[in-house]
C-alpha cells in the first residue's frame, strides 16, 4: 500500500510548463528514486512533493490524507514526513549532542528519554566520538549522518532525501547507502532525488525517470536502465547493471564505461 503518492502534478514558469502531469508513488518500506537529466523537471517535482512549492494542478497524498495544500512543517508534524535538504541544516554553533537534544526538547520529550534516545542515535550513526564537537567542525560525512540522525528524532514514516550523496567522499557514500538500506529494513519509506545516479539507482527498489516534464519510465533498476529512451537521453549506452553480491543488490558495470572511454 502506498504511503506517499503524487497524482497529475503540473507546474509552469511563465509560458514554460516544466512539469506536465507527473505521477509517482512510494510503498511502505520502499526506497524509490526520482531521477532525470538536468532541466527535466525532477527537482520541481520533488519540491512540490515536499511542500516547498505548490502545484498548479494535481494532488499529493500522504498516509491517505490529501496534503497538497499543507506546508512542509505540517506534513512533518501531522503526516509523518521527514525531509533532508541538500544544504546543511545542522545548528552549526551547537555540538553534535546538542543538535539532537535541541530537537527532542522542541518536541517536548522528557529529559530521561532525551538522554537515552540521544545516546542511541549517536551510537547508531557512529558519531559518538564527535558528540561534543561543534557541528561546524564536522566532516561532510559526519554532518550528513548527524542530519539523518536528527531526522529520526521525529519518528518519520517516510523520508525525502534531496541530493544526499553530494559533497561526500566514496567511503561516506557507502556508509550513507547502508544507512538508507537500514532505514528501509526498519519499515521507513525513502524517496531520493540525486544527480549522482551511480550512487542512487543501485540502492533503489524502484525508480522513476523524468524527461521534459513528463514521466519517461519507471521500474526496478534493471528495468529503467534498459529503457531505450532513458539510455539515450540520460544513462548513456555504455552503462549496465549487474545483479551483484551483498550488501548491494545491483552494482554498476564500470568496465563497460571505462572500455568505451578508452576506445572512443
Regions found by a protein language model. Name each.
Residues 54, 66-82, 87, 111-115, ...:
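ABC ATPase NBD coupling module
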Residues 159-163:
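Catalytic Walker B motif of ABC-type/P-loop ATPase nucleotide-binding domains
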Residues 134-138, 142:
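Conserved ABC ATPase signature
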Residues 50:
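Helix-to-loop junction immediately C-terminal to a conserved catalytic motif
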Residues 35-37:
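The feature captures the beta-strand-to-loop junction immediately N-terminal to the Walker
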Residues 65, 101, 112-130, 177-181:
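Conserved ABC ATPase "signature" region
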Amino acid at each position: 500500500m502506498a504511503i506517499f503518492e503524487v497524482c497529475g502534478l503540473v507546474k509552469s514558469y511563465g509560458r514554460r510548463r516544466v512539469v506536465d502531469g507527473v505521477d509517482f508513488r512510494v510503498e511502505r518500506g520502499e526506497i524509490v528514486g526520482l531521477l532525470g537529466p538536468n532541466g527535466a523537471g525532477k527537482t520541481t517535482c520533488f519540491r512540490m512533493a515536499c511542500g516547498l512549492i505548490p502545484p498548479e494542478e494535481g494532488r499529493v497524498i500522504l498516509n491517505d490524507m490529501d496534503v497538497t495544500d499543507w506546508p512542509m512543517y505540517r506534513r512533518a508534524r501531522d503526516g509523518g514526513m521527514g525531509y533532508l535538504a541538500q544544504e546543511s541544516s545542522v545548528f552549526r554553533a551547537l555540538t553534535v549532542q546538542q543538535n539532537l537534544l535541541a530537537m527532542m526538547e522542541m518536541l517536548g520529550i522528557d529529559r530521561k528519554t532525551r538522554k537515552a534516545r540521544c545516546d542511541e542515535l549517536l551510537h547508531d550513526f557512529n558519531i559518538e566520538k564527535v558528540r561534543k564537537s561543534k557541528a561546524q567542525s564536522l566532516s561532510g560525512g559526519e554532518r550528513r549522518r548527524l542530519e539523518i540522525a536528527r531526522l529520526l528524532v521525529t519518528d518519520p514514516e517516510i523520508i525525502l532525501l534531496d541530493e544526499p550523496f553530494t559533497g561526500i567522499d566514496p567511503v561516506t557514500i557507502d556508509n550513507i547507502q547502508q544507512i538508507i538500506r537500514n532505514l528501509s529494513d526498519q519499515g521507513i519509506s525513502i524517496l531520493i532525488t540525486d544527480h549522482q545516479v551511480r550512487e542512487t539507482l543501485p540502492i533503489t527498489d524502484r525508480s522513476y525517470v523524468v524527461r521534459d516534464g513528463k514521466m519517461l519510465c519507471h521500474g526496478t533498476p534493471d528495468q529503467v536502465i534498459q529503457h531505450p529512451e532513458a539510455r539515450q537521453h540520460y544513462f548513456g549506452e555504455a552503462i549496465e547493471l549487474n545483479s551483484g553480491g551483498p550488501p548491494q543488490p545491483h552494482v554498476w558495470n564500470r568496465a563497460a564505461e571505462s572500455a568505451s572511454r578508452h576506445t572512443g
